[in-house]
Amino acid sequence: MSLWKKISLGVVIVILLLLGSVAFLVGTTSGLHLVFKAADRWVPGLDIGKVTGGWRDLTLSDVRYEQPGVAVKAGNLHLAVGLECLWNSSVCINDLALKDIQVNIDSKKMPPSEQVEEEEDSGPLDLSTPYPITLTRVALDNVNIKIDDTTVSVMDFTSGLNWQEKTLTLKPTSLKGLLIALPKVAEVAQEEVVEPKIENPQPDEKPLGETLKDLFSRPVLPEMTDVHLPLNLNIEEFKGEQLRVTGDTDITVSTMLLKVSSIDGNTKLDALDIDSSQGIVNASGTAQLSDNWPVDITLNSTLNVEPLKGEKVKLKMGGALREQLEIGVNLSGPVDMDLRAQTRLAEAGLPLNVEVNSKQLYWPFTGEKQYQADDLKLKLTGKMTDYTLSMRTAVKGQEIPPATITLDAKGNEQQVNLDKLTVAALEGKTELKALLDWQQAISWRGELTLNGINTAKEFPDWPSKLNGLIKTRGSLYGGTWQMDVPELKLTGNVKQNKVNVDGTLKGNSYMQWMIPGLHLELGPNSAEVKGELGVKDLNLDATINAPGLDNALPGLGGTAKGLVKVRGTVEAPQLLADITARGLRWQELSVAQVRVEGDIKSTDQIAGKLDVRVEQISQPDVNINLVTLNAKGSEKQHELQLRIQGEPVSGQLNLAGSFDRKEERWKGTLSNTRFQTPVGPWSLTRDIALDYRNKEQKISIGPHCWLNPNAELCVPQTIDAGAEGRAVVNLNRFDLAMLKPFMPETTQASGIFTGKADVAWDTTKEGLPQGSITLSGRNVQVTQTVNDAALPVAFQTLNLTAELRNNRAELGWTIRLTNNGQFDGQVQVTDPQGRRNLGGNVNIRNFNLAMINPIFTRGEKAAGMVSANLRLGGDVQSPQLFGQLQVTGVDIDGNFMPFDMQPSQLAVNFNGMRSTLAGTVRTQQGEIYLNGDADWSQIENWRARVTAKGSKVRITVPPMVRMDVSPDVVFEATPNLFTLDGRVDVPWARIVVHDLPESAVGVSSDVVMLNDNLQPEEPKTASIPINSNLIVHVGNNVRIDAFGLKARLTGDLNVVQDKQGLGLNGQINIPEGRFHAYGQDLIVRKGELLFSGPPDQPYLNIEAIRNPDATEDDVIAGVRVTGLADEPKAEIFSDPAMSQQAALSYLLRGQGLESDQSDSAAMTSMLIGLGVAQSGQIVGKIGETFGVSNLALDTQGVGDSSQVVVSGYVLPGLQVKYGVGIFDSIATLTLRYRLMPKLYLEAVSGVDQALDLLYQFEF
């Protein structure tokens, strides 16, 4: 073999070995694992925990990668490749899944990257693939990425894609639980601000007119070439749920749907549906990114942002961006408005036509309407370099008269000429003509005219007629201004007082004024200002002469006269003042006399004096007899005295000090200070030293104490208050008796509090002040009167603390009740100005409900223990709570309880932003099981749900109602609605109503309830509406004994409550019953109560007949009642049918008209029966007087066998009944003794003797 052949053979073998090695490493599972192991060993910072499977099912677990500034953790990576697609010249990836991914990037720790030279633009980029690429499924599960202060979190993401040639198709995609937490802009700005070492001079800003001229001299929309996208994109369906962005604003998107495609520059938006916390958006449309850029977009939105909550927006955009663009907007809801606009963005000058129309506009948008604009029409036509503007509307509102506003104006990019602004109101017109120019400085020239203004009709208490003219001109430039009013005239009258204002004036931002004359006149009262405050000289006089202010203006009264003079120069001014006023009155405020005298000069030093005396200041709850203020001296030595005499505050203080102009420092002393207040006198125990340093902007306040008979507040050390400082305040004693004047009569408090506050601040540094506050109570007791009973609450320990340090606020408390439990806890808020994260705990230990027993009457009590162990989490916007609250052994016995409660328990478990409730209410008969849950993950849309189920729970409302109920009800609550649904079965009940109290009187429909101020009370309405839908089933063992009716009830009722009120639907039947009235024993043969609406308006269908055993001739006679409850219709019927007179005779007498019995005897029996029926209450009261319970007088029998019977209980189990015949005088004595609850022994003695054993059955 030749050398060439050997070399060729060796090369071939090497190539085959290389290819075989690559094939082994890539194509086999063992080789692939070997590759990952090598990468784990040789790649710095890479750590692969576990590798399983091959290309068809490859899984990497516990993967980590760390480099300076970069840390990546991956719990699980899965890749499944469809190798069979390679035979078809395509790439198929069946699955690419990432789970539990954690990425942290700190750009400050990363090494600086090398600067990459920008590549030259080589023309449009085309992306295409020579082989089809299919990614069947890509999934992200629990992915968290943090880049500096920005956090991105994805809970679940699934998608797929297909890339063939130039078309990329995104398969149906789902994204759930996306959170993007952005840093606040203010925080980023603070981090990025760096003080420059050298101040570079800034070029002068262009005037606004020149800036606008340059802006509109060329098209707003620059020349645009056709946009060439590198590939065609088709998003079949993108769904998102619970997407949230936080930062300076918090945006939550509940659901989102996107369908869009872009083929060769033609973009089509099939659907964009967004449901977020700010509102709902639905959009669709098309756009072409070439030629004239035609667009056609439709958008509908409903806002959920105050004050425009519920606002509906409809937007339609059509035309072309490079030709004419047309926009239409329709607003409905709090704001109703139509906007139509046409513009050409690609044309210089920005041609623009805008029309705005609205039938009515209100302010505020929600709640009570304070202002209203009707028939608003606004029109803008032309270009921004030459446009006309017009507006028409009518306005009205609170405290403003109805007016019609008309505006006509013309303008360009450098000025606007207000041809006329007319406000037609108060039977006159107000017109404004003006020119506003901003070519160089902002300058104006205007003329305001008042013509025929008459307020008599709109404001009858302040009638006036006014005419006037005001001319003004001025300019504003570089932070300075100047103004000139060459003419100011106002004439007319106010409440028959002549009004005259005449004058001219001019001034500037340097407070230099020239006032040739300004005269104000109102009736006999006048004021005049004349002079100038020049650059150097000061010569200004102001005089007031008001001998008759009474009724000059509504609520004004008194007299005033005075003079103020300003003389000297700017360097050495002098102020002279002498003003006297008497009998001043304004609305409810009155002042008997005011006297002001002053003479202040400023040469090398400011010196002078000022005396102010005010007598008899009076207004509701305030009565000050005298206030005097006296100040005199110079800069070097001056003093001030203040004296106040009156109620509710009186007192005095002295302030003396000196000022060093060179050092800009003032030192002083506050002394002789005391005040009388509603909580007692306060006085200083020592003088307060004051020191103000103007250069440092700092004041020092020396140690001192304020003393009160019930309190002492001290500053133990000097307070230096400035940009930075510290203050310590000690509360040495505070007796709660001080609060008595502010407490209601039903509340009393006693005890002593002590405490301390220590606060330090430094405004030159970021962050909040540092400080702490502590309060400790000793012998504290609060007594609250409830239902005329005192409820004392004594505190063994009462400590409160508050602290703010290291950007964390903390509130703590420990409250231990005497002979009872303890309530303690602490709440922390971290980063109060930023994220405001919550932490802490709340504990309740061995709190016994027996502490409220003093408010109960004899025989009533409460028992039970409350305990809790709760932990706080989350943040202020989304608070979280963990732990459990338990109430065990709770037993409340009282007349107000509808059942006999036995020891019961209730537990509430909190888990973050959700909670569950479980409990059992035990009674002597039956139990009620409570279950529920609550969710406040959306704090503005919280919800709660409670279910109650029970079986034959005995309900007792003495002395009338006993019943067994089986509830199965559900109560649900949201911020907008309370609902109560379910079913209540009443299988057994006994309802007994003997009579109503003699004092029971129905409330008149025209009763008006008054409050403590004798003002009508407004009816209380639920802040949250209540809806109910309850089914009440009345079983077969429900009986009623009321007002002579003894009957059994059955039926079903549907209790419905909504915004219309309470309603009943259903039917109550009376299958059997008896009615005793007016001596007659009637049997209810048919009874129906039909409910369909208000509960007090049932439809009656009742038939009651006389007892056939007490009716002769086998005749049935009765009464039929039909119709609504408030308008029933009663008729007498009989069987067989007969005349009304005969039927009435059988109903009342039990005999027909042709009966042989004596009419007098029958009438006697009927009258006695009627009388006895009406005397039941009187007989009962007589029996109670003699110790006989349930004494009753009744009649028995019919015709000649009629008897008057008296019965009563002489002993709890022994009943005596004595009957005497009305016509035969035969007496019958009956003794009945109860052996057992339903077993009786009865002995009868009369014409016949009998001894019976009776047993009572109930059906």
UniProtKB/Swiss-Prot annotation:
One of its GO terms (cellular component) is plasma membrane. Its main location: membrane. Keywords: Cell inner membrane, Cell membrane, Formylation, Membrane, Signal-anchor, Transmembrane, Transmembrane helix. Disruption phenotype: Loss of cell aggregation when adhesins are over-expressed in a double tamA-tamB deletion mutant. The single mutant does not exhibit growth defects but it shows a slight increase in outer membrane permeability. The tamB-yhdP double mutant shows defects in outer membrane lipid homeostasis and sensitivity to bile salts and various antibiotics such as vancomycin. The loss of tamB and yhdP severely compromises the integrity of the cell envelope, and causes lysis and alterations to cellular morphology. It is a single-pass membrane protein. Residues 28-1259 are periplasmic. Changing residue 1102 to R: Can only partly complement a tamB null-phenotype. Mutation significantly impairs the assembly of FimD. Does not affect interaction with TamA. Belongs to the TamB family. Interacts with TamA to form the translocation and assembly module (TAM). The periplasmic domain is elongated (up to 160 Angstroms long) and forms contacts with the N-terminal POTRA domains of TamA. The C-terminal region mimics outer membrane protein beta strands. This region (residues 963-1138) consists of a concave, taco-shaped beta sheet with a hydrophobic interior, which can accommodate and shield the hydrophobic side of an amphipathic beta strand, potentially allowing TamB to chaperone nascent membrane proteins across the periplasm to TamA in the outer membrane. This is Translocation and assembly module subunit TamB. It comes from Escherichia coli (strain K12).
